[in-house]
Amino acid sequence: DWVYAKDTYDAFSKQHPELLPPGITDPQIALFETPLGEIVRLFSFILKGDARGAMNCVKILTRIDDVRELVEQKSPQAKYLYKRFKEVNREYQSLLKSGCAAAKKQDSLLLFSYTDDTISLTSDLSNELLHRFPDKTIIVCREKSGEMKCSLRSATLLLPPLVQQSLAGLEGYGGGHEHACGSVVKTHNFDEFIRRIRKQI
């Protein structure tokens, strides 16, 4: 589901080459291997957590005049947003390290789960894990309130039918794009859900 819009890339790179070096045509490279990627994660991470805190960050974000103000933390507003970003990023980097460690060389499925009642990072984690392990099917799950909330990614498999077939008869639901899906399944059905997915990949 990565999109490369050449005109947009070229215009942004021309204006901000320090964030997006010229010549990059792969959206994954732009997102995970350039300074621009940190800005993208900042936008994602400041919206995590409770709604009041997220809306406060959005309000502050409207007072930022230029991306350089944000990157260089030139104002109190930019410093506040970066402080919030760093708080979430510490947790993200710790989970990412654990997710990478969960990858097994001979296993085509990278399954990683964690427990957190406050912040959902499954989508962000599954995207980066797919970038790092493009030959694997990625499933990142967060356990909360008796459910496993999952983000699934694959560079090659069509995920919606795979998810629907794996959920048949179980307490859960899911769907999404061709190569990026979400699903929620009760914890007591989770092992069976994963067993069915393994049979299809």
Q: Where in this protein do the model-derived segments appear?
A:
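A structured phosphate/pyrophosphate-recognition subdomain
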Residues: 1-105, 115-116, 132
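Glycine-rich, acidic loop segments that terminate in or are immediately followed by a histidine
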Residues: 11-18, 108-201
